[in-house]
């Protein structure tokens, strides 16, 4: 008996056994608490989960601290408090994993609650063990004050940008200080609405795979992968929807500050001295460069900006010591996870770095190649659960069609060098693709020559970096190279998105130059200074630059040159003082320029766009009862994706993941479309019926052009109803499979859709009234009365306009027009001299109104500057044939899909089919959908590759649609394999290191400090 007791005691001495016992008891506390709360209270799954986890955390701390990871030494109160704070912090991270993971399995994978909870408990158990063992109860853990002392430079490099951003918040009245925001351009029109939908899914336990709130129905995983994959984004659950813009500004500010810290870490490693005071200005310059000031509203890009220094630090560690690849793998994984688009540019940069790295000999080169390729593939595999679905999705977009541009230059290279100088305004958006953000401090320019002439820096390192900055500068100015850097994609108004790589190299070179200065380098320093001043003289003569910039650069060059020379000559405490003064001067320039940059960028006043959000939401709620299988829209949006912001099941979508086939189909139905967008603008009775748009909300100061019935006014917002909104699916003729959206005339395309689906012809009839042109700026010609095109010539330079007017000649007309022209900005429409509308109308259908004979209609076209001469404008005029539309609607409405269950990524309903044919649905086609008819899986058909359709036989049928993101299964397999390989490699490395340390361990190593002192 005693033998068994001794065995049990020995077994209990093993830490892993104790952890399994304590972990099992903690899991029991968690599970029992969770299911009791779910059974006896009305708490939501997430709320019950959080309470259960908090109870488990309290139990687990004492179990782990005093039973599992027990120490022979008596713990001080301070250590207990520190351990408790660390433990709770780590467990809170695990709580996020558990809550999100449970909801993901329940709502996205549709697993049972109990099964989901058990699966996640296993994952959390592993995470908690690693954190407790390696961080919380680590026996040789450093005191906090020692950690702070060892890393004070990195901390300062974080604090300075953080303080700058806080002051910016106060001065620019951002967030709680005045309602302004850093979310501008696409961040306002795309990201904020997408974050709203993401927020809704996280808070209300929705699917993270699919959403009906974006573009009629979209793959949410694709959108998360492109815009919102950063783990830090989970903080949005702490904010209400109306304060999400504040959460986004917080994220931007945190990432900017972290960029300073990571750059400081890299520079400290680069020159093997992490406590050099001069690191600070270079790190802050990276965090507050013009690239960051201009483009930080792309908050998902900032993850890659902040992780780049760690990727490069890990890369260089790996090249020096082949076994040291953990930092590289994990940091590259983080970059790929957070934003694969910008990380693609980093990967191209890494390949160039690797090619230009000195591998010493062919054997080392082969070994480095295998290691670099292997760890890079491993990092990609670890993030494959997002990368593979995202790659499949991006290949359905317009950008998947690659048209390589010619080898051409945007302009003079000196125009780009000009962007490196102080007081250069950062670019936040620009149509010219040759624009670039390069400024990161005048001292960075000065140090280029000093770096080149520094004899302490290895020649091949200098050659590598010079080649890289020259190649990058070429790429900024070259159409083909630019296209490749941007992922074989056009830039669309945000030029040279990879210029942060140039800034990174420039600052790295600059710091390496100044960190390796001594008296022997004075000749090289002098030559470098001469080169810098020579560049400035040339720039003054050959570049159109403001005199203030030239003078200020002269002054800064002189001051920095003097400071560097004094730094070289002085030793001891004097050198530290000079370094401190020089750092302060550099920081002053950077902070001043950043302040001017943000002043130039401006901010967005959120109340201008969402000031009436409560009223709009009240109107939406007046007709919305939970999830419903019909669509709603806003009459005139203030931001492009505004319907998504309100979590409406709308039509519009402006985003980088939009399907090209869907864009083309929406164009064919009369909507406004762009390269990566389709909007509700252009809706007409046919498209509104087919897509099931039942309600429209109109702010009372807006013009209403859509033909719908007024229902009510709720808090100043008018509610309109489309009585002919069809259900999600309905029967049509098989001929609709042959419909294409490529007709040159939208009215013809719509007529074709109606005729193929119902057999009814002539829904829209094009008319040709006598049109009169008028303009003081343009000569207008119209030779053929049956042509919808009007010649434009003799165009006056500058902003111009012209008008086309006509009279109604029939008794009754339900009039629609299409008005467009290259270079157009807005169109103004008058009916009998009274302005009806003035907005951005492009190639889309527009409802002028129900007009009677003799009514005059005038359409004015307004252009931006630079309209090409000898171009043409288009005015297509048509009337809606009410009888034909009524007949078509009756044909569609006869056999509709009645919905029984409607969730994100899941639809179930029944339909009675009078005659075998095609069931058209307004569900956007995605290969992730699977269809079932009467319980049997069936092939999905498509209409124009854009909408899902099913072949159905006569009779009653139960229809079911299930969604699972394409590529996710294989992605999860690769991710599991990648992490497994990484864990095995790390474990093997740890075992090897322990064995090595034991072999070299002296016999008396186990003695205490007191014993050693006695001897």
Task: List each language-model region with its residue ranges.
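Active-site-proximal, structured, solvent-exposed surfaces of multi-pass membrane proteins
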Residues: 146-147, 772-1015
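Extracytoplasmic/lumenal acceptor-recognition loop(s) of multi-pass membrane glycoenzymes
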Residues: 585-606, 621-690, 726-727, 731-757, ...
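Membrane-interface coil-to-helix junctions
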Residues: 162-263, 284-305, 394-398, 407-432, ...
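Periplasmic/ER-lumenal interhelical loops and adjacent helix-loop junctions
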Residues: 185, 190, 196-198, 231, ...
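Membrane-interface micro-motifs in multi-pass membrane enzymes
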Residues: 221-225, 246-258, 278, 285-309, ...
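Contiguous transmembrane helix-bundle modules in multi-pass membrane proteins
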Residues: 342, 463-474, 479-480, 489-615, ...
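Membrane-embedded helix bundles of polyisoprenyl
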Residues: 161, 253-270, 275-360, 371-396, ...
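Transmembrane alpha-helical segments
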Residues: 259-267, 307-319, 348-356, 445-452, ...
């Amino acid at each position: 008996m005693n033998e068994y007791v001794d065995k049990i005691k020995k077994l209990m001495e093993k830490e892993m056994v104790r952890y399994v016992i304590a972990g099992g008891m903690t899991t029991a506390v968690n599970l029992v608490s969770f299911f009791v709360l779910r059974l006896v209270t009305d708490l939501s799954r997430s709320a019950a989960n959080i309470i259960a986890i908090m109870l488990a955390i309290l139990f687990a701390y004492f179990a782990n601290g005093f039973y599992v990871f027990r120490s022979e030494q008596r713990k001080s109160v301070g250590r207990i408090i520190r351990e408790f704070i660390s433990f709770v912090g780590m467990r809170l991270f695990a709580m996020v994993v558990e809550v999100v993971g449970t909801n993901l399995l329940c709502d996205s994978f549709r697993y049972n609650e109990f099964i989901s909870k058990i699966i996640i408990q296993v994952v959390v158990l592993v995470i908690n063990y690693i954190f407790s063992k390696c961080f919380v109860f680590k026996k040789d853990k450093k005191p906090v004050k020692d950690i702070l002392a060892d890393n004070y430079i990195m901390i300062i490099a974080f604090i300075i940008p953080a303080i700058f951003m806080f002051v910016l918040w106060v001065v620019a009245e951002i967030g709680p200080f005045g309602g302004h925001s850093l979310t501008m351009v696409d961040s306002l029109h795309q990201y904020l609405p997408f974050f709203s939908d993401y927020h809704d899914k996280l808070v209300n336990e929705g699917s993270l795979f699919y959403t009906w709130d974006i573009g009629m129905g979209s793959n949410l995983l694709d959108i998360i992968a492109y815009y919102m994959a950063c783990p830090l984004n989970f903080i949005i659950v702490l904010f209400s929807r109306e304060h999400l813009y504040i959460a986004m500004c917080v994220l931007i500010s945190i990432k900017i500050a972290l960029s300073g810290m990571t750059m400081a870490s890299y520079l400290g490693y680069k020159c093997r001295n992490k406590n050099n005071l001069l690191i600070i200005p270079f790190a802050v310059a990276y965090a507050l460069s013009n690239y960051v000031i201009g483009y930080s509203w792309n908050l998902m890009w900032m993850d890659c900006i902040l992780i780049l220094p760690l990727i490069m630090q890990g890369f260089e560690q790996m090249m020096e010591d082949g076994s040291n690849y953990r930092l590289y793998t994990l940091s590259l994984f983080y970059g790929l996870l957070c934003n694969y688009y910008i990380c693609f540019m980093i990967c191209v940069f890494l390949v160039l770095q690797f090619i230009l790295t000195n591998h010493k000999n062919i054997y080392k080169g082969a070994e480095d190649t295998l290691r670099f390729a292997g760890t890079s593939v491993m990092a990609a595999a670890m993030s494959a659960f997002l990368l593979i679905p995202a790659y499949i999705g991006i290949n359905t977009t317009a950008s998947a069609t690659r048209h390589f541009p010619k080898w051409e230059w945007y302009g003079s290279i000196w125009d780009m060098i000009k962007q490196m100088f102080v007081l250069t305004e950062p670019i936040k958006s620009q149509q010219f693709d040759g624009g670039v953000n390069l400024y990161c401090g005048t001292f960075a320019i000065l140090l280029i020559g000093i770096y080149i002439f520094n004899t302490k820096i290895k020649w091949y390192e200098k050659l590598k970096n010079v080649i890289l900055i020259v190649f990058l500068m070429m790429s900024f100015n070259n159409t083909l190279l630019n296209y490749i850097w941007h992922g074989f994609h056009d830039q669309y108004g945000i030029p040279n998105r990879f210029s942060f790589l140039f800034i990174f190299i420039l600052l790295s070179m600059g710091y390496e130059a100044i960190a390796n200065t001594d008296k022997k380098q004075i000749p090289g320093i002098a030559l470098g200074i001469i080169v810098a001043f020579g560049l400035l003289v040339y720039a003054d003569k050959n570049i159109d630059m403001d005199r203030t910039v030239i003078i200020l650069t002269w002054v800064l060059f002189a001051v920095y040159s003097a400071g560097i020379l004094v730094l070289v000559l002085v030793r001891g405490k004097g050198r530290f003082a000079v370094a401190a003064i020089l750092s302060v001067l550099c920081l002053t320039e950077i902070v001043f320029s950043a302040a001017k940059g943000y002043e130039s960028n401006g901010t967005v006043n959120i109340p201008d766009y969402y000031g009436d959000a409560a009223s709009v939401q009240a109107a939406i709620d007046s007709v919305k009862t939970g999830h419903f299988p019909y669509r709603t829209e806003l009459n005139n949006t203030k931001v492009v994706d505004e319907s998504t912001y309100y979590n409406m099941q709308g039509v519009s979508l402006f985003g980088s993941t939009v399907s090209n086939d869907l864009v083309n189909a929406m164009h064919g139905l009369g909507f406004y479309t762009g390269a990566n967008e389709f909007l509700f603008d252009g809706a007409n009775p046919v498209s509104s019926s087919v897509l099931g748009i039942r309600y429209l909300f109109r702010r009372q100061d807006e013009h209403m052009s859509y033909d719908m019935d007024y229902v009510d006014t709720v808090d100043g917002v008018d509610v309109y109803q489309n009585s002919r909104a069809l259900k999600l699916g309905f029967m049509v003729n098989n001929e609709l499979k042959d419909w294409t959206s490529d007709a040159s005339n939208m009215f013809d395309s719509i007529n074709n859709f109606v005729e193929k689906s119902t057999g009814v012809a002539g829904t829209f009839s094009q008319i040709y009234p006598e049109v009169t042109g008028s303009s003081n700026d343009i000569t207008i010609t119209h030779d053929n009365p049956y042509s919808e095109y009007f010649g434009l010539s003799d165009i006056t330079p500058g902003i111009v306009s012209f008008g086309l007017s006509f009279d109604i000649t029939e008794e009754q007309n339900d009039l629609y027009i299409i008005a467009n022209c290259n270079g157009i900005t807005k169109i103004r429409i008058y009916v009998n001299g009274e302005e009806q509308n003035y907005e951005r109308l492009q190639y889309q259908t527009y409802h002028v109104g129900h007009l009677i004979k003799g009514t005059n209609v005038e359409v004015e076209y307004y252009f931006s500057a630079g309209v090409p001469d000898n171009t043409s404008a288009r005015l297509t005029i048509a009337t809606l044939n009410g009888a034909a539309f009524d007949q078509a609607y009756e044909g569609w409405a006869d056999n509709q899909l009645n919905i029984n269950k409607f969730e994100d990524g899941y639809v179930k309903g029944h339909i009675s089919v009078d005659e075998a044919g095609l069931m058209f649905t307004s569900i956007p086609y995605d290969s992730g959908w699977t269809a079932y008819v009467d319980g049997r899986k069936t092939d999905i058909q498509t209409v124009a590759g854009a909408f899902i359709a099913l072949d159905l036989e006569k009779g009653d049928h139960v229809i079911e649609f299930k969604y699972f993101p394409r590529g996710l299964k294989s992605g999860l397999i690769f991710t599991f394999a990648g992490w497994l390989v990484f864990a095995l490699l790390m474990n093997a490395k740890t075992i090897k290191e322990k064995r090595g340390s034991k072999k070299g361990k002296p016999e008396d190593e186990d003695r205490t400090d007191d014993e050693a002192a006695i001897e």
